[in-house]
């Protein structure tokens, strides 16, 4: 039976002094054996933590006492083994990097519940934009969604400004944009709606809870999602009902590998995949192969490979 609760959370709110929050939060996590990463910035908090159920509840109670966090609702999963090596509480300029320093992320667009999402994106007047990175989109996407082909979220503002010019050239600048955006768990699409509003787009919507809530709530026969959804944990990808998908993670380049690419002679488990095989030299491949051998050996013994006792990090 799974014994570790994994809680993914974020909240855009105003913290006047994130540094004053950092120390007590890190100390609490350390005292309770909670591990993971939490990012703090003047715009809020973001991260994922894991630990015993009671310990996670205590940390969440502490976070909910912070300004603007009273109704914080994390996404919860369960793991048989501790998925993190240590606790990190970091101060950042942004909790998710967009690179627009004057943006107010609390001035976001309109939430759309998963149950209402299909109707919205089926409207021919609505332009649907995927705010995730290109490698995530390749794993799965909503039918008809626009793929910005970004390498990072920070690329999104420049892409949007260029894309908007091309749209206005076709439709005319007087035609109002009506945009629906989505991401994995909600944080990127929420911040991107604030960005679009700052750019003067009035009708902007985002999927509440992101793709994960949609896949959890919408039955597959009614779904407009195609493929799987990449996730940033050991599952790599999930499908409807949040069932673990068929993608695996390449330990060489950290990119998802499809079932088709897993069948390629260029895929070597723990070493390389078709995307990075020719970019890695023999020395790199040999080191990766040795590390993978050690990982498999430790798994067979039922022990952690490295880092299980790393200290809490505050930076």
Swiss-Prot record:
Signal peptide, first to last residue: none
One Pfam family matching this protein: Rhodanese
GO biological process terms on file: tRNA modification
EC number(s) reported in the record: 1.14.-.-
MF GO annotations: oxidoreductase activity, acting on paired donors, with incorporation or reduction of molecular oxygen
Domain Rhodanese: 122-223
Source taxon at top rank: Bacteria
Reactions accelerated catalytically: uridine(34) in tRNA + AH2 + O2 = 5-hydroxyuridine(34) in tRNA + A + H2O
InterPro entries tied to this protein: Rhodanese-like_dom, Rhodanese-like_dom_sf, TrhO, TRHO_N
Residues forming the catalytic site: 183 (cysteine persulfide intermediate)
PANTHER family per UniProt: RHODANESE-LIKE DOMAIN-CONTAINING PROTEIN 7-RELATED, THIOSULFATE SULFURTRANSFERASE/RHODANESE-LIKE DOMAIN-CONTAINING PROTEIN 2
HAMAP family in the cross-refs: TrhO
Family: Belongs to the TrhO family.
Name of the protein described by the UniProt record: tRNA uridine(34) hydroxylase
Organism in which the protein naturally occurs: Caulobacter vibrioides (strain NA1000 / CB15N) (Caulobacter crescentus)
Lineage start: Bacteria, Pseudomonadati, Pseudomonadota, Alphaproteobacteria, Caulobacterales
